[in-house]
Amino acid sequence: CRVCGAIFASQDDIEEDVHGTGFWCPECERFTPYAGITRIIDLSVCLETKACDCRERQMDEQVKSDLQGRLSPLRYPGGKGKMLKQLEPHFPEHIGTMVEPFAGGAAASLAMLFAGRADRIVLNDLDPGVYAFWISVLKYTEELLNAVHNIQGTREEFLQAKRILDRPDGRPTVELAAAFLIANQLAFSGITKAGIAGDYERRWNYKKVADRIRRIAAYKDRITVMHMDALQVIEEFYWNADHFLFIDPPYVLQGKQLYREWYETDDHKRLAGLIQDLTLSYPGCAKIVVTYDACPETEEYYDFPYVGKFYKQRNYSCGCSRNTKD
């Protein structure tokens, strides 16, 4: 085994993959390819490093891109709108369907759709508020905008929105969507489970939000919104070579503080295990790009054959870097 070094006396001691190109180790459950085997696997993992902690691993090339980063109405923690120029070289020039199993603000998918580089996009999120928002943008556009038209961006409106998000069960879709939008716009960094932003009085901009929502709604025939477990979505859409899976799960180190639907250690391991199983056992299907925070855990989870890791810089609040605007 190339991972743990275990030696086996015969093939009866190992589990060969269905294509006969390698085997699964019974000791560490990792995959080892046979010598001389080349696989058609299109899997890249982007590990985000802090702007003040990139050192020699950081690759800061500036890339010209046709992808716009300010299309989503949402402010989203970990959103990829500011990183599109860095991620763009790893995206397909054109794809039939782009799928985001952890949609969030959906900045990457919207950029690909509006640039004409994706024919359709699939936005999935398990967070009830996020799902309600995107389904309302497409199906109940004017109802959603009417629900927030008279919002002034006050602390009381923010707290009421948070109360709705804390108890989403049984809420009408548009009510939940409006609450999510209000909390997202007024919260610190768009974190709806956090406190209100210090400059909340200036955060609410109905015209900008309405313009972006209506622009997205114009593409409703090319956007599918789902509310499923992300692993099920990955399994469903992996098998088509004309699909692009952009997998942007909750951060490992701060996920619980940032998201209402976060991942525990076992969840991160299951996700990495599924991606490993699909790409190694059934290569040549969908293109996959995974984004994560750079840390020892993610380095370990994605330490398997044929994965192309690259490091990108994200600006965080710190003493030596300046954040860009939302």
Where are these regions (language model features)?
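Residues immediately within or flanking Cys/His clusters that coordinate Zn2+
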Residues: C1, G22, T49
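Short metal-binding segments enriched for Cys and/or His
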Residues: E27-C46
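SAM cofactor-binding core of SAM-dependent methyltransferases
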Residues: H94-L165
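SAM-dependent nucleic-acid methyltransferase catalytic core
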Residues: M59-Q86, E93, L138-F246, P250-Q257, ...
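Short cysteine-rich clusters marking metal-coordination/redox-active sites
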Residues: C1-C4, C25-C28
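Short linker/helix segments within small regulatory modules
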Residues: D12-G22
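Cys/His-rich microdomains that often coordinate metals
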Residues: G5-F8, T32
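Long, positively charged, glycine-interspersed low-complexity recognition regions
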Residues: T265-D326
